[in-house]
Amino acid sequence: MIAAAANLTDAFQTLGPKFEAETGIHPVFSFASTAQLTQQIEYSAPFDVFAAADSEHLDELDRKGLLLAGSRAVFAQGVVALWIPPGSKAPVKRLQDLTGPEVRVIAIAKPELAPYGDAAIHALKSLGIWEQIKSRAVYAENINMAKQYGASGNADAVFTAYALVLHAGGTVVPVDPALYPAIDQTAGILASSEHPDAARKFVGFLLRGAGRAVLDQYGYRLSTKR
């Protein structure tokens, strides 16, 4: 079983069948915020692989002896996007437009749980507009849930992963990666894995060939880190 950060939902659901076709192994995914999955792993959830939205949570698990030695790899870098859902009347083409009166509700994943939420707020602070708009923010448990605020008409603008809204319609504004710390999508194999060979194959799949092609398709920046 693969614990995967919420931003990876669409990409992993696309690459899952490709991995199965190549290896004969059927991957089962559990998607949630990186912090929530880390907590589940600390409480002995039966995962084989953890694909996180940062490296810090894997550092934490590594220090506690919960990762298989030498199994970590940065497989991509995530891109934050501002999404104006179809039907939203907010005239937003760039982040600075969020200060306009037409933007009443902005959905963001909780920064203490989701690296993408933390990165979004970092970008807004970098632009000097966070203090002007923070009273309009509503916080979701993860970026999938933040997206749902917009899809249901309960938010005028949403900060989420570019990968989740690339094909969602509306207006998608990728946030300049220079405005926030790199989002190193990092995978590792759990020391408690009952299927370490299959886990190694999945992590390897993310680093080459068809796996990397899917990540590229969903707008991830392909990492040269390992």
Q: How would you name each of these model-derived features?
A:
Residues 1-31, 35-45, 52-68, 73-78, ...:
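Exported/periplasmic ABC-transporter solute-binding proteins
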